[in-house]
């Protein structure tokens, strides 16, 4: 198997890299952790125009089906880390693959039986079903809170940049308006500080929790350069748009003023 990495925010990059051997176009949107947005419909149309048999696979973890529905935009397969928003309570590790029946039957036969062998336990399945019952209510709250928290970050002098699809100034805001019901509960910010200062500041948070996961009821904060992307070289971090000052925030269900107060106390020290 050969994998080609390319920036799909420019559709010309996709066109240049499609070959007669291409079988899958795989991407996530919003992208982690920069929240760059990709046009699902445009990418799917371009790939299928080149070869209808190419499978377009979209990781929809950040949005869930409540905010974004890739299959309706032309994608063939959707994957979720169900550990995140779909479960929503931080107590299950699970994944979901969504697609046409013939494809899913292959996943069950060859993927589970011959390759991974992993299926959810009955109790984990119960917890997932429980979480899905409140998905719409939770996502509405995550998004409403994130919009308020993002607005606060835009006005704080310690913050150089705010990455949030709900801001008019965010590149790709038009794509969000086209394919997302709401802007989501994820925010990334660029702090005017070096790695040591950022770490010291984050360790002072009282309400918010430092953790690499996302989509929980609690607000979770992580420093990509030293946590989720710590294995990246300096060159790889730069190519991915990840600086030492970048902080990713999964805005939770708490009172938004409490979240803002926690961050204000910390950011005022920078």
Identify the residue ranges that each predicted region occupies.
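PLP-dependent enzyme catalytic core of the Aspartate aminotransferase-like
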Residues: 3, 12, 16, 20-23, ...
